[in-house]
Amino acid sequence: METRKLSSCALAVRVALVLGGALSLPALAADPAPQPAAKATASKDTSDIERIEVTGIRASMKASVNTKRFSNSVVDAITSEDIGKFPDKNVAESLSRITGVSVTRDFGEGEKIAVRGTDPSQNRTLLNGSAVASADWFVLDNPSRAFNFTLLPSNLISSLEVYKSPQADIQEGSLGGTVYLKTFKPMQLDANTLKLSAEEQYSDNSEKWDPQLSGLYSWKNDDETFGFLISLTRQDRTLVREGKESLGFVRQTVDGKDYWAPRVIGDANFEQKRERKTGFAAIQWRPAERWDLNLNILNTKLDANNTNHNLYTFLNDNFNPADAVISGDHIVAGSADNATSQLYVIDRISYSKSKAYDFEGSYDADVFKVTMKAGFTEAEGGTSRDRHYQFSRVMDHVTFDGLNHTDYVDASNTESRDQLLARPFDWMQEGARTMKDEERYGGFDFELPVSHGIFTDIKAGVYYRDHDKSQRQTGTRFHWYKDDQLNGAWGDVLPGQTNWASGVLGQYSLSDFVGGDSTANYPLLDTGKAAAIAYPDAAFASPTATFLFLADTWKVNEKIYSAYTKGNFQGEGFRGDVGVRFVKTEVRSSGYLWDGDATAAAISLLDGYSLLADAVDPSAGGDWNVRQETAKHSYDDILPNLNLVFDLTDDTLLRFSAARVMSRPDYVDIAYHESLNIPTRSGQRGNPNLDPTRANQYDIAYEWYFSDTGMLSGTFFYKDIEGLVKYQNVDAQAYDEQAGENVLVNVTQPINGAGSEVKGVELSYQQEFGNFGILANYTYTDANAKEERDPVTSPGSGLTLGTSKHMANLTGYYENDWLSARLAYNYRTHYYDGISEYGSEVFTDNYGQLDGRIGIKVMENLELTAEAVNITDEDIEQYHIDKSAPSKKYSNGRRFYVGLNYSF
């Protein structure tokens, strides 16, 4: 795609059109040691650090430094001014600037985070101390425990902290660290605080402008006994991701030796329109002097409709050994005969939405304090409509070199663009996938000041969580249309694939679906025109047109009971806390498994879904023969922890922490589901009897605070992890409809493996030099799985997911009375990223991103801003085992923002 540069004229016009605005919400008072439901104590007098006015970068740095310094735990923090000054439109981007925290940016925007060499699903995110349900919009994302940060705009957050060593009063479930987000409270802000922001975003890949709007209003009465806050945000983005990809590697024999060879190579054009709307409301009421009642309501939705055009070449097993170019253990270039080429288009209506209702009430009687917490959160995401279109042809001879390949319209294959347009329609299918996440929770905390020995207060509490995670997948049957070149197997209609109302689809060609111009060497579909032809309303009048994919429909319920006790202590030159958390988890997993009995009776369905009897009876033309199953499992955990801080001097301290932590397995792994591919005799299924991954962890840290905003720190961390989830192959019996008999299928299922050992070092430095300043950090992580490496028979063995050995951040800034500027660079080295579509390993290569922001104060309450994301236009690149075998390369492009911010 030709890169079009943003002209200064266009930029000036956009700035002139932007109206209203407010920056990162308010100058506010912040607690210098914001530990959830805990009082941080220090052995030195801290009475002079009660409240900090966050009015600029330096004040923000001071607040973050104090949070870290006076916490008993190993904590890193960012305040509201940090988030507002960075070019961060969601919280994940802000978190990526903390030591030990990495972020995924599959579509050019931070989505999920990981801490200290762990998987994103092994780290919890809490909003005001409670979970927020989340779901993914992307069809290839499995329901997991990882929080989707694309739902949460950063202007909602007053501060964030990453707890790398646990406290007994913080919810369990994090193996790497717990992200603790705090929103603004009405009593924090001045009465009638108003913040407005209006921006325009330009994406250079899509060459589109999109609006970014937000506003916040906060009020409280003169007595400060009642207040409310309302925040509204809308952020649009037109996304184009251009890519080349290999969907996996398989073993091929050349001259009697096996090598890894690409299975499918393709070009991908992904287009998406994102529209995120978020509403947040907070009510704070103090009905009496000792009471404090808070209600927070969050409602956020992301519409993420997208279309993906793929031009694939299936090399199949027809490699020409004489043409193979070998590099190490890979065939990196060569040719194949009788390959298949496809123009494959997917058009999706995708979304993700979350709601959270959180209530907290406290009564402080001086001699004791009681806090009650209760709430409900729910989320839903996925694709409400997922339409597939395919046009195929057989190619006599193709060549490939890395991710370059002979494509559908290559002239050497004697098919011109006009001939391509005359190709008949191959097949189509429509589906929908809905993922739901719900949690109901409640608990009590009791805090008692004491003066027994070194202890200053004792805290205890109980907590209950009832969590549901489910997935439902529906679809039409596959509909194939005869093409003599496709050798029968693809042209024949199988049982259960008849009676589609639009049975004349075979008369259409690609030219009937094409609309508009394309800069690519192949035409793009007009999806509206294609839908009118392939999916007329009459097609769905047939009662058998749509059915439930039982193998991908399941539900998991967890009931979690926890209790804890914790003591804060302080002595001459030391302080800390010690505690223990007791947790019981009860799991109930329901789903559907294949049944070897071809005459099995009809089944009942989860959550009241209905299903026609012929859908489960092969003799009636049904596709499956299944049975519903429910499994129960439970486990208990005792999680002690110790945080100890020694004040070496007035400016230096030494930390030590030790703890037992746990992380529950991903929902898709414990779901009772089974997905089988009978022709290939392969499949996958879940394992409801998985136990959590557990670890013993230790931290030692040295910290030097040489000024109010200056700090130098070093931390060594170690985790001995046990029970990491791995995958094994087992034989299972299934019914083959075409053969009319039971067959053995090789099924991959998760089990608890040996574990891993993670150790590393975090270094952090920040200092100001007059109006200039610098923030820098570096993380080294060495993660080793406790099993042998075998990428051929056990892909992923001996590897730890998502772990980069080296990560670094460097930020420079300048600030005076009217100008504020920052330039921030984030870097991480390669890491193991999971298993490909064909079961081979995928690694993501080194990646660095440069972002910047400038703010100019044009009036007392008005600021003009300009921001840039991914300034150097970096691509995301992946490979298989070694870099000689590229797997994927994606360009998300750069983004630019111009805007006005107004505060009153």
Feature roles, as predicted:
Residues 92-134, 164:
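Extracytoplasmic beta-strand/coil segments of soluble accessory domains associated
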Residues 242-267, 307-345, 390-427, 480-495, ...:
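Solvent-exposed loop segments that connect transmembrane elements
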Residues 717-721, 725, 730-836, 872:
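Gram-negative outer-membrane beta-barrel transporters
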Residues 827-834, 855-904:
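C-terminal beta-signal and adjacent terminal beta-strands/loops
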Residues 346-348, 352-354, 552, 556-559, ...:
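Outer-membrane beta-barrel signature, preferentially recognizing the C-terminal barrel domain
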Residues 183, 198-201, 209-220, 267-308, ...:
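Outer-membrane beta-barrel transmembrane strands
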Residues 53-86, 112, 123, 135-137, ...:
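N-terminal periplasmic "start-of-domain" segments of outer-membrane beta-barrel proteins
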Residues 139-146, 155-162, 169-252, 260-263, ...:
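Outer-membrane beta-barrel translocator/receptor signature
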